[in-house]
């Protein structure tokens, strides 16, 4: 839910934000566009999945090799032994639940704002706290129903359809957009990301005011960590029977490369419009802080925007219906 909603919310908005407010160099230049994708990759790349891999591997190892419960407390077994079954273990699980709630709250906020923005774009539904409270109630009801239903065939089918819709929308943007440019941009983005990975990782803005690092990098690290109990538990459950090498390769590189592809298709398509002076209305939304509207404004530049906007709203809503069935009961 966290990654899915974030990918919808930030795929266009984050690159454009870094483009018009470049932390390095001059804004709104070709160089700023290139750097914007590197920064986006940095926040959505291997660091996030490394956090999930550490938690997931710890849980999987102790659960499947030592027959311990598939809960966060089991990772502390080498330190406190059988006391994981007592108050200390219970406290660890409670902290994990509270941490996950912070991640859910963040994702819920982004998701509700974007759903409201999509409804405003399509049906002129006002963007207001009242509408958003109603949406929160509906989404909470959907998530509660999902938890009560459990991981049955219907939930699995819903998850598969969600993935199918996401890939279909991404392929549409790829085909309807600057296809050849996106292929080259994907390759170059990865190269630039690898080239600057160490520098960005150790950048704490020691010689500056640290505002950008706090607002972006530290925010993302906190968001990924808050989701790590849930995502790590899910990864552990589906990884039984894999070797550690297979686990690390599958968790770190597969999702990262797909995320990079997603961000390239959406982000570079919008950046190309911006560099060519064709995205002034979208850039104005970014400047005005109307970030939830940015994705729909971008889709409006492509054919069949009404259909793709509906699909985007569905993709934001559906992760809540998939969130937290079996895993949430185990956290």
Feature roles, as predicted:
Residues 1-121, 174-177, 181-185:
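Transmembrane-helix bundle segments that line or gate the permeation/cavity pathway
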Residues 3-18, 143, 259-265, 284, ...:
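Alpha-helical transmembrane segments and, especially, the helix-loop junctions at the ends
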Residues 8-10, 15, 60, 64, ...:
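Hydrophobic alpha-helical segments of integral membrane proteins
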Residues 11, 248-249:
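Membrane-interfacial loop-to-transmembrane alpha-helix junctions, especially the N-terminal start
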Residues 47-71, 145-151, 225-244, 310-314:
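Transmembrane alpha-helical segments in integral membrane proteins
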Residues 84-85, 165-170, 330-331:
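Short amphipathic alpha-helical segments with coiled-coil-like heptad repeat character
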Residues 96-242, 249, 254-308:
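Membrane-embedded translocation segments of transport machinery
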Residues 312-331:
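Cytosolic-side transmembrane-helix boundaries in multi-pass membrane proteins
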């Amino acid at each position: 839910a966290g990654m899915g909603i974030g990918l919808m919310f930030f795929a266009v908005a984050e690159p454009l934000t870094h483009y018009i407010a470049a932390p390095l160099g001059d804004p709104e230049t070709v160089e700023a566009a290139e750097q914007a994708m590197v920064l986006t990759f940095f926040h959505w790349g291997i660091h996030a999945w490394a956090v999930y891999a550490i938690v997931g591997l710890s849980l999987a190892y102790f659960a499947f090799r030592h027959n311990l419960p598939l809960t966060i407390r089991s990772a502390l077994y080498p330190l406190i032994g059988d006391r994981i079954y007592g108050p200390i273990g219970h406290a660890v699980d409670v902290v994990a639940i509270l941490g996950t709630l912070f991640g859910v709250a963040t994702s819920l906020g982004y998701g509700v704002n974007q759903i409201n923005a999509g409804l405003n774009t399509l049906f002129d539904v006002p963007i207001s706290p009242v509408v958003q409270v109603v949406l929160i109630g509906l989404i909470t009801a959907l998530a509660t129903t999902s938890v009560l239903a459990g991981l049955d065939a219907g939930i699995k089918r819903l998850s598969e359809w969600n993935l199918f819709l996401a890939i279909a929308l991404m392929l549409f943007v790829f085909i309807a957009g600057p296809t050849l440019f996106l292929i080259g941009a994907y390759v170059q983005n990865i190269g630039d990301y690898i080239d600057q990975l160490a520098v960005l990782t150790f950048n704490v803005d020691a010689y500056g005011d640290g505002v950008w690092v706090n607002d972006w990098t530290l925010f993302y690290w906190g968001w990924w960590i808050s989701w790590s109990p849930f995502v790590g538990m899910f990864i552990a459950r589906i990884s039984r029977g894999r070797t550690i090498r297979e686990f690390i390769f599958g968790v770190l590189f597969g999702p990262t490369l797909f995320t990079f592809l997603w961000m390239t298709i959406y982000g570079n398509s919008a950046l190309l419009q911006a560099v060519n002076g064709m995205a002034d209305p979208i850039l104005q939304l970014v400047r005005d802080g109307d970030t939830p509207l940015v994705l729909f404004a971008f889709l409006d530049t492509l054919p069949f925007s009404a259909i793709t906007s509906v699909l985007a709203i569905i993709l934001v809503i559906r992760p809540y219906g998939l969130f937290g069935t079996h895993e949430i009961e185990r956290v």
